Amino acid sequence: MAAASTPPRAERKRXSWSRLPGAQRESAGLAKKCPFSLELAESGPPSSALYAPVSPPSAPEPAPPASPASPAPPAADQGPQPPVSLDPRVSIYSVRRPLLARTHIQGRVYNFLERPTGWKCFAYHFTVFLIVLVCLIFSVLSTIEQYATLATGTLFWMEIVLVVFFGTEYVVRLWSAGCRSKYVGLWGRLRFARKPISIIDLIVVVASMVVLCVGSKGQVFATSAIRGIRFLQILRMLHVDRQGGTWRLLGSVVFIHRQELITTLYIGFLGLIFSSYFVYLAEKDAVNESGRVEFGSYADALWWGVVTVTTIGYGDKVPQTWVGKTIASCFSVFAISFFALPAGILGSGFALKVQQKQRQKHFNRQIPAAASLIQTAWRCYAAENPDSATWKIYIRKPTRGHALLSPSPKPKKSAMVKKKKFKLDKDNGVSPGEKTLPVPQITCEPPEERRPDHFPVDSHDGSVRKSPALLEVSTPQFLRTNSFAEDLDLEGETLLAPITHVSQLREHHRATVKVIRRMQYFVAKKKFQQARKPYDVRDVIEQYSQGHLNLMVRIKELQRRLDQSIGKPSLFVPISEKSKDRGSNSIGARLNRVEDKVTQLDQRLVLIADMLQQLLALHQGRCHGGAHPAQARDGDPADPELFLPTYEQLTVPRRDPEEGS
């Protein structure tokens, strides 16, 4: 495969543009926004260039392709042409061996140095740590007279190697920081150099250069001034933790438990001051066996207090009198207990922080599983929607232009492309086990049409991308079963054309998509359930306690609604009855009382209805001119049945005459 030499950007763009047909120049404008140039690979002479033998379904009969050497007619006269068969992932790249971009190399170097992940990064940084540690050991040995001669000579050459190494690494770090948007340009590099860890690296390099330049006769740390700079080389140990994760963890623990630490330190400091002062008062005139006053000043007492309450106990100063010993013992028990508390607080804080990080990791695993479950559930729901937006993700986008076909790449290059894509996905944080849901592409049988004779089938088969998610729909081949079939001009193989519009989807396509979506939903549901499983007994206990708390809240809400509906017991239960029977205040007893009240109310309503019926019958009898039977019998116009019942008659039940007598 011949590839053109790398001309300037403008000339290469003009050459690519001139080789494109008129219908493709519009689509080639997308390459202007890409940092890579759009190049067409040519294999052999231009006459041997091949087009894809598949045409869009909307075209009834494709026009024969024009030679690249001939002038391209307008797009309207040329008619629709077959789409390009290049892989969309590499359509903007040259078919030659891909050249690594400058920004891509910067990004890989930056991630390798500043964001180490993987065993290669670990091996590199661990080796640097070992070299720095060995150099530090030789620096310590150079201060011992027994090993000074051997250590200083070896240390001199090690310092030269480390200065060159750290200086080169500092320059490479400064250069690779340009892949970040905030570190682009001169001011961006200065912003990167102002980082604390970058300042430490620069100080270490400069200090090492000063040590090597001032050292005489190959002897490092020869003068007293150079020995003072030796401390700066200890800062190389900070090179191991460039991200500052250790300091951030310590700072977060101290910030979270700042109140407890401040309280314990304050009380311990007060205990130290008072104990030192009282011991000084008791021991300021005491003389030891050698005739010397041990606590001659308050500063001596403070030194004794610090050594005692921190449980160091040098033994250089000891109380001599029994009063001083008693005061020292009492205050020591009190002060030591408070000075030991910060260690326990920090230890428990670190343990809680580690546990919190583990829970956060476990929770972060649930996020992609939950997102996949929501996505698949929505797709299952949307599969019943006949709108075109539901099915657009399964439609292959038609290319706007038409380009020349290139021979299939070698297996080695395709493997390199796959490996490169895997590395890019890994750098972007996408692990192989957490890939996004695949969207299958649907292909269908194209309409019967006349193919040009110079379109070989083998080249088409190699140009169509095969994937496990590709749904292929093919018709059975025609078999020559009799002599009449021999006269038919039949195709030996049925070609598959990608579906480019929703209207081309058939019913079996939609049914297949629904089945795939349902399967994806069940798989996502299973993964989400696995991610939701607790990984610790404490999580199980926490879930049970949270569930119990929610249950109690709901029970209280139900109790409040019942009190609002049927009333509280204190509203209709006398105080004397509350102490007699506790069970009468239960919900069942209250409901029984409500039912009794409803029954009494129903009886009253029945009585009122009977009285109203009697009044209605009396009124109807008067209207017809007839006398009321009771009036004819008694003749008493003041009969109470002739009038409406009073309030007492409705509320107080009537008594029988026998009971009244």
Curated annotation (Swiss-Prot):
Processing and modification events after translation: Phosphorylation at Ser-27 by PKA; increases delayed rectifier potassium channel activity of the KCNQ1-KCNE1 complex through a macromolecular complex that includes PKA, PP1, and the targeting protein AKAP9.
GO CC, any one term: basolateral plasma membrane
Region (Interaction with KCNE3): 237-245
Biased composition (Pro residues): 54-85
Residues with the Phosphoserine modification: 27, 406, 408
Coiled-coil stretches: 584-620
A Pfam family this chain is assigned to: KCNQ_channel
Self-association state and partner proteins as the record states: Tetramer. Heterotetramer with KCNE1; targets to the membrane raft. Interacts (via C-terminus) with CALM; forms a heterooctameric structure (with 4:4 KCNQ1:CALM stoichiometry) in a calcium-independent manner. Interacts with AKAP9; targets protein kinase A (PKA) catalytic and regulatory subunits and protein phosphatase 1 (PP1) to the KCNQ1-KCNE1 complex, allowing PKA-mediated phosphorylation and increase of delayed rectifier potassium channel activity.
PANTHER family: POTASSIUM VOLTAGE-GATED CHANNEL SUBFAMILY KQT MEMBER 1, POTASSIUM VOLTAGE-GATED CHANNEL SUBFAMILY KQT MEMBER 4
Protein name as annotated: Potassium voltage-gated channel subfamily KQT member 1
Organism: Oryctolagus cuniculus
Lineage start: Eukaryota, Metazoa, Chordata, Craniata, Vertebrata
